[in-house]
Structure formats: C-alpha cells, structure tokens
Amino acid sequence: SLDGVSIASRRFYEIYHQYNMKGIEFIPFERSEGYYACKFVNIMKFDVERSKSIRIEYQGKVSYGVLDNGKCAICQRSFGHHHPFPYRMTVEDEGKLKQNTFYRSDIEFEERNYQSPILWATDGIIQAFTKEKCRIFYKNVEGYFGEGDCGK
C-alpha cells in the first residue's frame, strides 16, 4: 500500500502455510475477508556502506549509492531517495538467513507517493510460488496525477 503496509491475499496466505514458510504474522482485515496485513517479524540491517560503492546512472546523472528521485514541478515536494539494486543486508545478517523465510529491512525507502521496507525472500519461497503458478512480486505502477507530479 502507499503507506508501506504489505497486504496479502488468501492465495498468498494459503501457499505460505502449505509450504511452511516463516517470517510473517498475518492480521486479517475485518471488512475485507481473504486479505491480510503482513507483519514481518525478521528485521535485517540494510548495508548502507556497501551500497555506497555501487555506481549508478539515472536520468543522465551519475551517483554512488543513493538516487535522488527529484521534486514535484509545482510544489517542489521531494520524491525521496532510494538505494539502487542490489539491495544488500549486512554480511553478519546474511549469515543468519534461514531457508523458506521472509525478511524486511530495518529502514524504509520513499519513492514518489509511497514508502516501504525492502522485502527479502530466501531459497524455497520463489520456487514454491513458481510451482503454484502464482506471482508474488509486482512492479509498482505510477499514475498521472495532473499538472504537477503530486496532483496539484
């Protein structure tokens, strides 16, 4: 969602339990049966230092480690900053990973009109969802909000 809450469908919930996945507590919505807010219980540290070594080019600008998403042309509100792929956790946390488990980053990133943590899935999860012919990761789609990027 736009405020960083991850929402799961009943299908996701069923596959998660069928394959004995770990790392998420599901909180059912009272008025939307079959949908759940996800509370990620395993929090890993995003490795800010390692991300600084990644050279990136974005819209003609060269940067290391952090992308400035720019500002609204009308109100000058910042669209935030984000770190480029690959999104890495610290080496210490990488050594603690368990199979079939979800993790989230300790910090959240803002881009345009939403903010959220980075979500990681370990071995077994992608394979399970592929086997069940179910997509779990979707590209974020930005819409047209009027004259300025913020809708003003």
Locate each region found by the language model.
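Extended, low-hydrophobicity, polar/charged segments
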Residues: 1-152
